[in-house]
Amino acid sequence: MVENVIWPAYLDANCTRNEGRRVAEDLAVEEPTVDEIASAVQQVGYDAVIERSKTYPREYEPRGRVVVKGADDASKSDLLEAVAAYVTAIRE
């Protein structure tokens, strides 16, 4: 079973590509939380586990991470784009 890790920095509009953002700027959102990301992952159809004590290596403050389980059929970039779209929809 494949496990993908999604750090909030991957979807953060305040981060540059060098700082860790992995989606296009128009898909990125301002300061996404692990709760929003986990909710979006579940809406996409995968299981999500929140690990709040983890810190992205390029950041100082711990924001946590989301571990996605069972995403064998999707590439990581496709998964990130779908999650970013759902996080945007959740905020509206």
Curated annotation (Swiss-Prot):
Protein location: Cytoplasm
Keyword Ribonucleoprotein: yes
InterPro entries (alphabetical): Signal_recog_particle_SRP19, SRP19, SRP19-like_sf, SRP19_arc-type
A GO biological process held by the record: SRP-dependent cotranslational protein targeting to membrane, signal sequence recognition
UniProt keyword terms in alphabetical order: Cytoplasm, Ribonucleoprotein, RNA-binding, Signal recognition particle
Keyword Isomerase: no
Disulphides: none
Top-level lineage group: Archaea
Major localisation: cytoplasm
GO cellular component, one term: signal recognition particle
An example molecular function term from Gene Ontology annotations: 7S RNA binding
HAMAP family recorded: SRP19
Subunit structure: Part of the signal recognition particle protein translocation system, which is composed of SRP and FtsY. Archaeal SRP consists of a 7S RNA molecule of 300 nucleotides and two protein subunits: SRP54 and SRP19.
Family statement drawn from the similarity comment of this UniProt entry: Belongs to the SRP19 family.
Function as written in the Swiss-Prot or TrEMBL entry: Involved in targeting and insertion of nascent membrane proteins into the cytoplasmic membrane. Binds directly to 7S RNA and mediates binding of the 54 kDa subunit of the SRP.
Protein name: Signal recognition particle 19 kDa protein
Species of the source: Natronomonas pharaonis (strain ATCC 35678 / DSM 2160 / CIP 103997 / JCM 8858 / NBRC 14720 / NCIMB 2260 / Gabara) (Halobacterium pharaonis)
Gene from which this protein is expressed: srp19
